[in-house]
């Protein structure tokens, strides 16, 4: 498939899937839920995209249409979220079939990597399910997402992910944000000893990125870097909401902010280069 719309502001060779230590000393992953946000992330200097839908729910599987157009629009690697719904990470047999089908389709439409996670009812990594999904993902690299933050024993869970063959784990340190979970993130990185990438994520902004990177020793980080912009709609029916909450207006849109991505990029370069 021929790619179109490559960023004119930052032309570069395609980056490998994501071993820690990119050519510029760090790796920034931006989670996005639209083509516009994907393009903005690349323009701002992101090294990799995590493509999702439903970011307000923590990220769910995007449509294959979005994936197809994103792949036509950016040159940086696109890792695709495989999560059939919001909520917990304990999946039914039918949900598992959906996840398997989505992995196959994501590979067909050009995903550079996959992102998923699954737990047992007692808060352990679901080894059997993960092995089954990993077999379908091969040879693509796989990230275990923030289901990790819901595990019973994070240190033991990290070793489990290593044995299963995950390339990285995304975590807020089992806390409300990466800043709050910084002590555990540091311990996880020390335990990993480079065998698996421990990638901080959750509430990362220009105000706390330096502290998180310096305090953890991480060489990759995950952020959304979004801003809210007003809808272009002129006629507005403010008494109707499409979602469950009136706090989420149909007339304000959250998109990745090029300036925010550039700022985070500059902070990380200053620390790690």
Swiss-Prot record:
Record-linked SUPFAM superfamilies: CutC-like (SSF110395)
Matching Pfam families: CutC
Gene Ontology CC annotation, any one: nucleus
An annotated GO BP: copper ion transport
Keyword field: Copper, Cytoplasm, Metal-binding, Nucleus
The keyword Metal-binding belongs to this UniProt entry's keyword annotation: yes
Keyword Cytoplasm among record annotations: yes
Domain of life: Eukaryota
Consequence recorded when altering residue 31 to A: Reduces copper binding. Reduces copper binding by 75%
Subcellular location: Cytoplasm; Nucleus
Tissue note: Ubiquitous.
Functional summary from the UniProt entry: May play a role in copper homeostasis. Can bind one Cu(1+) per subunit.
PANTHER family: COPPER HOMEOSTASIS PROTEIN CUTC, COPPER HOMEOSTASIS PROTEIN CUTC HOMOLOG
HAMAP family registered for this protein in UniProt: CutC (MF_00795)
Subunit structure: Homotetramer.
Family membership noted in the UniProt record: Belongs to the CutC family.
Name of the protein described by the UniProt record: Copper homeostasis protein cutC homolog
Organism, as annotated: Homo sapiens (Human)
């Amino acid at each position: 498939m021929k790619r179109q719309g490559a960023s004119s502001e930052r032309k570069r060779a395609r980056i490998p899937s994501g071993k820690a230590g990119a050519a510029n000393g760090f790796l920034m992953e931006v989670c996005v839920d639209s083509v516009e946000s994907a393009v903005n992330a690349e323009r701002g200097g992101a090294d990799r995209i995590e493509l999702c839908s439903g970011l307000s729910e923590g990220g769910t599987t995007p449509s294959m249409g979005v994936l197809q157009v994103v792949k036509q629009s950016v040159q940086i690697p696109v890792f695709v979220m495989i999560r059939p719904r919001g909520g917990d990470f304990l999946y039914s047999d039918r949900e598992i079939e959906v996840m398997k089908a989505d992995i196959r389709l994501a590979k067909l439409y050009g995903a550079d990597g996959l992102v998923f996670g699954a737990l047992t009812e007692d808060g352990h990594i679901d080894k059997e399910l993960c092995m089954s999904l990993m077999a379908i993902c091969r040879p693509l690299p796989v990230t275990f997402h923030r289901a990790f933050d819901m595990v019973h024993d994070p240190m033991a869970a990290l070793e489990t992910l290593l044995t299963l063959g995950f390339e990285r784990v995304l975590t807020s340190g089992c806390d409300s944000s990466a800043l709050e979970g910084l002590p555990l993130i540091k311990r996880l990185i020390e335990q990993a000893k480079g065998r698996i990438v421990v990638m901080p994520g959750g509430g990362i902004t220009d105000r706390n990125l330096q502290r998180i990177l310096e305090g953890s020793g991480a060489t990759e980080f995950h952020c959304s870097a979004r801003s809210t912009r007003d809808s272009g709609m002129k006629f507005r029916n403010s008494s109707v909401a499409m979602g469950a909450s009136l706090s989420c207006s149909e007339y304000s849109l959250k998109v990745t902010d090029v300036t925010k991505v550039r700022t985070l990029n500059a902070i990380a370069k200053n620390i790690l280069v």
